[in-house]
C-alpha cells in the first residue's frame, strides 16, 4: 500500500484543534498530558468508514512528536484493546486511562523514550457477540491509519526508533499496520519498526507463523524484534475465542504448536505473573517489556 504523506499532513493541521476541544469538553484536557493519536468516531457502528474520513486519516491532541512537535529519540505507540461494556464517552475515557497507565508503567520501569497513545473505535457494534465482529473489523481497518502514523513520523524523524505495544484486540491494529507497511514507502526506504510487543493478544494463534504468510512476511520484513507475552490462564481470551472464534488466542497459548513463527519473533510465557488477569499485563510485565526494548 502506498501513502500520500503531504495530502494527509495538510488535513492534520485542522483536525488537531477539534480533538483538543473534545478533550476540553470532557474535562480532562488540563490534566491529560499523554500525546494522543485518535481515530475515534471515524467508523460507524457497523464498522464502515464515516463520511469525511479516509482509510489513512487520523487526529492528534497536538502533542505527538514528529507530527505536532519536534522529534524524540525513541517513540513507543501504545494501542488499547476492546471495550464491550462502556458507553461511547465511557469507552473513550477508559481508553485514555489505559494509555496513561501504559505510559506510567513503562516509564516507571525505566523506558526513557516517549509513549504515545493510539485510541480507536473499540466500542462499535452490538448483538449476541457484544459487537466483537464489528470491533475486529474496525481494528483491522485501523492498521492503515497506524501505518500512516509511522510513515509520517519516520519521514520527519528518520533517525528515531519507533515501537508498537498493544493490548488485547489492539494486536489486530498492530499486525494490520505491519501488513500495510510491508512493501510500502516505509520499507522501500529502509525503515523499520524497531520492536513490537503484543500483550494478551486477541488474535488467532497462527498469525505470526507461516500458516498466515501475509502476517509472517510483515513481521519478518518490517520489524527488527517482535515479542509476544501470553498467559495460559487468561480467562477473557478463553471466553472470547471459545465463544466467538472457535479457535485459540495468541495471547493465551502463544503461537500454534507445530507451526513455524517468523525468525525475529520471540515469546514470553507470563502465566506465573499474569494468571487469569487480562488487564494485568502492563502492571506485572513492564520490567520484562522494557528489558526487551
Regions found by a protein language model. Give the residues of each.
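Alpha/beta-hydrolase fold active-site loops
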Residues: 73-74
Amino acid at each position: 500500500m502506498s501513502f500520500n504523506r503531504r495530502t494527509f499532513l495538510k488535513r492534520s493541521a485542522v483536525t488537531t484543534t477539534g480533538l483538543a476541544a473534545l478533550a476540553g469538553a470532557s474535562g480532562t484536557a488540563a490534566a491529560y498530558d499523554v500525546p494522543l493519536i485518535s481515530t475515534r468516531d471515524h467508523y460507524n457502528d457497523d464498522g464502515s468508514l464515516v463520511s469525511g474520513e479516509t482509510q489513512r486519516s487520523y487526529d492528534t491532541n497536538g502533542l505527538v512528536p514528529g507530527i505536532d512537535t519536534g522529534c524524540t529519540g525513541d517513540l513507543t505507540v501504545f494501542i488499547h484493546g476492546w471495550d464491550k461494556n462502556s458507553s461511547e464517552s465511557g469507552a473513550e475515557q477508559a481508553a485514555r486511562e489505559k494509555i496513561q497507565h501504559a505510559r506510567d508503567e513503562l516509564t516507571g520501569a525505566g523506558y526513557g523514550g516517549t509513549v504515545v497513545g493510539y485510541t480507536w473505535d473499540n466500542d462499535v457494534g452490538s448483538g449476541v457477540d457484544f459487537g466483537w465482529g464489528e470491533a475486529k473489523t474496525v481494528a483491522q481497518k485501523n492498521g492503515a491509519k497506524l501505518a500512516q502514523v509511522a510513515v509520517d513520523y519516520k519521514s520527519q524523524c528518520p533517525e528515531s526508533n519507533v515501537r508498537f505495544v498493544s493490548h488485547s484486540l489492539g494486536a489486530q491494529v498492530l499486525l494490520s499496520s505491519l501488513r500495510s507497511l510491508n512493501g510500502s514507502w516505509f520499507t522501500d526506504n529502509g525503515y523499520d519498526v524497531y520492536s513490537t510487543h503484543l500483550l494478551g493478544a486477541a488474535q488467532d494463534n497462527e498469525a505470526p507463523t507461516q500458516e498466515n504468510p501475509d502476517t509472517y512476511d510483515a513481521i519478518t520484513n518490517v520489524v527488527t524484534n517482535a515479542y509476544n507475552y501470553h498467559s495460559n490462564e487468561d480467562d477473557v481470551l478463553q471466553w472470547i475465542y471459545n465463544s466467538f472464534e472457535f479457535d485459540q488466542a495468541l495471547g493465551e497459548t502463544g503461537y500454534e504448536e507445530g507451526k513455524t513463527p517468523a525468525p525475529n519473533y520471540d515469546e514470553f510465557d507470563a502465566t506465573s505473573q499474569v494468571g487469569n488477569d487480562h488487564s494485568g499485563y502492563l502492571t506485572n510485565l513492564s520490567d520484562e517489556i522494557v528489558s526487551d526494548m
